[in-house]
């Protein structure tokens, strides 16, 4: 498991729904328990974006 997959697992455990979408203008968005991560990024970029969005949730 890479770091992104570990964060995804943590997010799901916390009741979050994470989807990859074609976002414009940002790498990630959060609204309630839903997180959108921009499609097409590298795994390290997705990891960084997901970590940032999870930080906004806690």
Predicted regions and their residues:
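Active-site hotspot residues in diverse enzymes, especially metal/ion-binding acidic/histidine motifs
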Residues: 1-58
